[in-house]
Amino acid sequence: MSKRIAIYGKGGIGKSTIVSNIAAAYSKDYNVLVIGCDPKADTTRTLIGKRLPTILDIVKKKKNASIEEVLFEGYGNVKCVESGGPEPGVGCAGRGVIVAMGLLDKLGTFSDDIDIIIYDVLGDVVCGGFAVPLREDFADEVYIVTSGEYMALYAANNICRGIKKLKSNLGGIICNCRGIENEVQIVSEFAGKVGSKVIGIIPGSEMVQKSEIDAKTVIEKFGESEQADLYRELAKSIYSNEDFVIPEPMGVDEFDEFFRGFQ
């Protein structure tokens, strides 16, 4: 039975960095599959070393694509897939996820030899497409990546609303720090407000940018660093976590009042 994890968060908050690094950490002991569910299609770049063709692009050219044509192996033999999205201004951004999950299921990608499946999902809006990993029972547990910034937490609160509606299991909040004042306190109190907890704190580091410029994870490029160890600790915390809740999101006014308390 695979451990099936969905990582949600606002666009640009660092989901892909978190996902690729914990996947790299898991690869030492487990068979891992990473599925990028973001129209930017950049989740797996640091695992593969380049951008992958997306499932949407592949099926446009070949409707009956094989598993070998959509699944790629990267660092630590991590299997990687990118769902992709439409051209800007054309169609639903979540459609790529719908098409991808249908094809991957049909091709038998979710086989028993996969130990851990990680979905990297855009979470500014939990619309039909982006809700697929949860709604269609492709994932069992959800983690939200946020910083202590207003819009990141606003998106996190909206994601909690979607998780509650879908009756999914929230495993915790990951604080991907941006260096703002009282950041860890803000995120910790937010987690408590929605009935959850902070499961990991990742400080900002130049190593992240240096690694991403080289299209590598921090685990690969700076494997002996404290930053790499923090990703390994986060991976362990997620793997061993058994504390799940259906979150209770704040109302809009309550959220604004909560945030004003830190000004």
Swiss-Prot record:
The modification ADP-ribosylarginine is found at residue 95. Binds 1 [4Fe-4S] cluster per dimer. PROSITE patterns: NIFH_FRXC_1, NIFH_FRXC_2, NIFH_FRXC_3. Gene3D superfamilies: P-loop containing nucleotide triphosphate hydrolases (3.40.50.300). Its cofactor is [4Fe-4S] cluster. [4Fe-4S] cluster binds at residues 92, 127. InterPro entries: NifH/chlL_CS, NifH/frxC, Nitrogenase_Fe_NifH, P-loop_NTPase. Keywords: 4Fe-4S, ADP-ribosylation, ATP-binding, Iron, Iron-sulfur, Metal-binding, Nitrogen fixation, Nucleotide-binding, Oxidoreductase. Coiled coil: none annotated. ATP binds at residues 9-16. It catalyses: N2 + 8 reduced [2Fe-2S]-[ferredoxin] + 16 ATP + 16 H2O = H2 + 8 oxidized [2Fe-2S]-[ferredoxin] + 2 NH4(+) + 16 ADP + 16 phosphate + 6 H(+). GO terms for molecular function: 4 iron, 4 sulfur cluster binding; ATP binding; metal ion binding; nitrogenase activity. The key enzymatic reactions in nitrogen fixation are catalyzed by the nitrogenase complex, which has 2 components: the iron protein and the molybdenum-iron protein. HAMAP family: NifH (MF_00533). Belongs to the NifH/BchL/ChlL family. Homodimer. This is Nitrogenase iron protein 2. The gene is nifH2.
